[in-house]
Design a protein with these regions (language model features):
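Active-site-adjacent "subsite" loops/lids of carbohydrate-active enzymes
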Residues: 41-74, 143-144, 149-210
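Aromatic-lined carbohydrate-binding/catalytic grooves of carbohydrate-active enzymes
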Residues: 87-123
Length: 418
């Protein structure tokens, strides 16, 4: 009887152990699944996951290869695309006009010195053609990125520009000299000139007509910043004083916003008239107060967010951490999502990979956050997804592969690639 009882007890114990292992395993698997789901937060299958390939990356290419030709450039760019793919990215935003120039054979703008070493010098191959081919061959979308108004940064010497540069040509003629303006040591196309708008729009049209791009992208270089002492007298103030808006008693702030609006609307219209499937988006500075300030940018952001006539998407550059003293990532993201409630355009969030692993930020708390928190990029993606954003763009390629940001990028991958 004792033996029988022992066998019964043993059988019960074994059964409990087996059941315990089974349910324990199920519990662990359920917990793991829950953790994975929590990490993902969860993304839509068509979520935009892009990264910027800036003019810095062309400079890095030139530094890496002594022999620079179509073969070495294709090799370099293929590495960039494959890196993005390995992290779960599905779009690359390539700089094609950083300084009133071109990374392709243009009818309007000179070759960029960022690719050939000297403005106006043909590199011997067409970078944009190679980039579109490589991106699509690897299942990745590609957008052509332009800076519309910037001609030269840190120099006002027109002789440093190519003789084929329209800015230099215009400067050489009195009639068109004000199409280009010098301000605080840099050169800009004058936003208030119709000839300038036509040039910029034509430059976009030739890209969409001649290259298999999926989108046109502009970033935050619009008007430069003014002060209370010169806001009414500097830059394009002369054009304002001669305008019907001035005569109609509308102030210079409204005038400047309207110049940018006209350009943006014209680009959107031109792109859609050529190929409705090609997108047009803008990545403005992340602080809405700065965008709507009477002293800088002159971006009519509320109009763009609440109309289908200007852009397909807005991608604010929210380049701050959760510990920023004033512009906390969560607060700024909330403000953008609230501003875009009409759902007329998509909202992507621009994220600063270049800060991860670096001692950078406003105040000791934010600097420590960027320097030590390996989950910072992942948490930003998770937070923005929870708030309903449509995707992300990460700045930039060099930082996605740098040693300093490696830990944060490794964690980022967990919420992008699955």
């Amino acid at each position: 009887m004792l033996m029988k009882k022992c066998k019964i007890v043993l059988t019960v114990l074994m059964t409990c152990l087996l059941l315990g292992n089974t349910f324990g395993s199920m519990a662990v698997n359920a917990a793991e699944a829950s953790d994975t789901q929590a990490e993902q937060t969860i993304a839509n299958t068509d979520e935009y996951k892009a990264f910027w390939f800036s003019y810095y990356d062309y400079t890095a290419y030139r530094a890496k290869y002594k022999k620079r030709n179509a073969t070495t450039f294709k090799k370099y760019f293929t590495h960039a695309v494959k890196k993005g793919k390995s992290l779960g990215m599905n779009c690359i935003i390539v700089h094609v006009r950083p300084f009133g120039d071109a990374m392709y054979k243009s009818k309007y703008f000179p070759w960029s010195k960022c690719i050939s070493g000297k403005q106006g010098k043909n590199p011997g191959y067409d970078p944009l053609k190679i980039m579109t081919q490589v991106a699509h061959a690897n299942g990745m979308k590609i957008e052509a990125w332009i800076n519309p108004y910037r001609v030269a940064s840190g120099s006002t010497n027109y002789k440093k520009l190519s003789t084929k540069n329209p800015a230099r040509k215009w400067h050489n003629k009195k009639k068109t000299r004000r199409n280009v303006l010098a301000y605080k040591g840099s050169l800009y196309y004058n936003p208030a000139k119709a000839q300038v708008r036509n040039l910029i729009v034509n430059g976009v049209k030739e890209i969409v007509e001649n290259y298999d791009v999926d989108g046109i992208h502009m970033d935050d270089y619009f008007y430069p910043a003014f002060s209370s002492s010169n806001v009414n007298s500097a830059f394009d103030a002369k054009e304002y004083r001669a305008s019907t808006m001035a005569k109609g008693k509308q102030n210079i702030v409204r005038f400047r916003r309207e110049q940018v609006n006209m350009l943006v609307k014209a680009i959107h219209s031109a792109v859609k008239s050529i190929d409705p499937s090609v997108t047009f988006g803008i990545s403005p500075a992340g602080n809405i107060d700065n965008l709507t300030s009477r002293y800088s940018y002159y971006v009519d952001i509320n109009k763009w967010l609440n109309s289908s006539d200007y852009v397909d998407y807005i991608c604010p550059q929210i380049y701050w951490g959760f510990k920023h003293p004033y512009a906390k990532f969560d607060r700024v993201t909330n403000r953008w999502m609230n501003a875009a409630k009409s759902k007329k355009v998509k909202v992507y969030i621009g994220i600063a990979v270049y800060r991860a692993g670096h001692n950078i930020g406003a105040g000791s708390a934010e600097r420590r956050e960027w320097r030590t928190d390996a989950n910072i990029l992942k948490k930003q993606v998770q937070y923005a997804r929870k708030k309903g954003c449509d995707g992300f763009a990460f700045f930039d390629y060099q930082d996605l592969k740098s040693k300093k940001s490696a830990k944060a990028v490794k964690q980022l991958k967990k919420v992008l690639k699955y």
